[in-house]
């Protein structure tokens, strides 16, 4: 399984896509790079409310306080959006996550303007859920 790119490489790769079809394919590819969740992790406690698709997000904290995010979805594009969000929050502490605004990154990628309203709402639900989980840890 290939590693996810960092924030800057994500932005570079995204800008190299010739059109939105290529960008969607890249997002789907990122989702395919996510490590699978175990059947036990596909539980009610990890499900994200407010997403049209099924979305599960697991948050762990290492001894140094850095958060590790893992997730899954039953929809390929949504799984890719999960990967994008995880890239933006990569190597952050719980406090960093609660303070970091991902929306400017979405604007740089012109992401939200090319998503359906239900996917945009689901993306916001994911961000709110991750920030809420991080706030409970910090």
Curated annotation (Swiss-Prot):
Disulfide bonds: none annotated. Keywords: Cytoplasm. Coiled coil: none annotated. Transmembrane segments: none annotated. InterPro entries: Cysteine_desulfuration_SufE, Fe-S_metab-assoc_dom. SUPFAM superfamilies: SufE/NifU (SSF82649). GO terms for biological process: iron-sulfur cluster assembly; sulfur compound metabolic process. The active site is at residue 51. Pfam families: SufE. The keyword Cytoplasm applies. It is found in: Cytoplasm. GO terms for cellular component: cytoplasm. Pathway: Cofactor biosynthesis; iron-sulfur cluster biosynthesis. Participates in cysteine desulfuration mediated by SufS. Cysteine desulfuration mobilizes sulfur from L-cysteine to yield L-alanine and constitutes an essential step in sulfur metabolism for biosynthesis of a variety of sulfur-containing biomolecules. Functions as a sulfur acceptor for SufS, by mediating the direct transfer of the sulfur atom from the S-sulfanylcysteine of SufS, an intermediate product of cysteine desulfuration process. Homodimer. Interacts with SufS. Belongs to the SufE family. This is Cysteine desulfuration protein SufE.
